[in-house]
């Protein structure tokens, strides 16, 4: 299974490609919030370097927030546009759950992100094992 993951929720844009649970490609670009200009070339480069096309992608995973409203819209719109022609499945990924997934120990996990204007996005006791089938969405 080929999974193309896109993250545009923050200042850096990220693209990754997983093939059968193996990371083939990963890149982050700190372009100063210019995701609208950099995301599609990042995806194009990823696919070319991995020898794949959009037709080879089985699932698109996209950061669905919390994060920059404009950044999230750019990522979601790009993935929706790529998925639509072939009705490829798309899966929303929570920023906070993705952070919690890096925790390998036991116990409570507290994730927090700067929401600007002296506010914080946070979640406690987040458990994230694997993307479940019912969490996937059609374009």
Regions found by a protein language model. Name each.
Residues 2-4, 18-128:
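Nucleotide and nucleotide-moiety/phosphate-recognizing core
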Residues 3-14:
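N-terminal amphipathic/basic leader segments beginning at the initiator methionine
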Residues 7, 26, 135:
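Acidic-residue sensor for enzyme active/binding pockets
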Residues 13, 118, 138:
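Glycine-centered loop/turn positions within well-structured domains
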Residues 130-139:
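Single conserved hydrophobic/aromatic residue that forms the stacking wall/gate
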């Amino acid at each position: 299974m080929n999974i193309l993951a896109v993250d545009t929720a923050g200042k850096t844009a990220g693209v990754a490609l997983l093939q059968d649970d193996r990371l083939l490609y990963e890149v982050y670009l700190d372009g100063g919030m210019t995701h609208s200009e950099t995301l599609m070339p990042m995806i194009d480069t990823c696919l070319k370097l991995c020898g794949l096309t959009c037709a080879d992608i089985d699932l698109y995973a996209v950061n669905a927030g919390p994060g920059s409203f404009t950044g999230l819209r750019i990522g979601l719109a790009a993935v929706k546009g790529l998925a639509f022609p072939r009705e490829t499945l798309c899966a929303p990924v929570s920023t906070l759950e993705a952070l919690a997934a890096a925790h390998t120990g036991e116990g409570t996990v507290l994730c927090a992100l700067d929401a600007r204007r002296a506010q914080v996005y946070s979640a406690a006791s987040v458990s994230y094992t694997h993307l479940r089938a019912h969490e996937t969405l059609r374009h």
